[in-house]
Amino acid sequence: VIVVAAAAGGVGGLVTQLALARGATVIGIAGPSNAEYLRSLGAIPVSYGEGLEQRIREAAPSPVTAFVDCFGGYASLAHSLGVPGERVGTLVPTPAIALRRARFTGGRDGKIADIATVAGLIDRGTVSLTIAGTYPFELEQVRAAYSELMSGHVRGKIVITIP
């Protein structure tokens, strides 16, 4: 069982789909408004907030063995669930992550082969990319896109179109 924090976001949604494509059971942490979306992907939705650890334990059909934090701040939760540091990945490095020996899994040094693999999964319909909104490359529109992003409740990716 893999837990994905921010599972309905752009990166979290892809992580969720990739894990499911590899046969994992995924518990996705997201807001209540995204529960049906996560179910449609094949994940088990769990709402964030008070009592999160207990809700994850109740939803998990077997012990949690990995944790991917696409939001930041969930290192202690992963630890409380018994996930070893080397089985925790995050996009947001913090001192707590370093202390628990978790992996920082972001960066610009992707591999061409990884891109080809994901592109193949998208072509076959195994993975889909959710677009939260599309904005033209104009100052006010870019500001609007940024405001939407900073709201913290974007499902999928925001696209800026350049003519």
What are these regions (language model features)?
Residues 1-163:
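Terminal helix/beta-alpha structural elements that buttress the NAD(P)+-binding lobe
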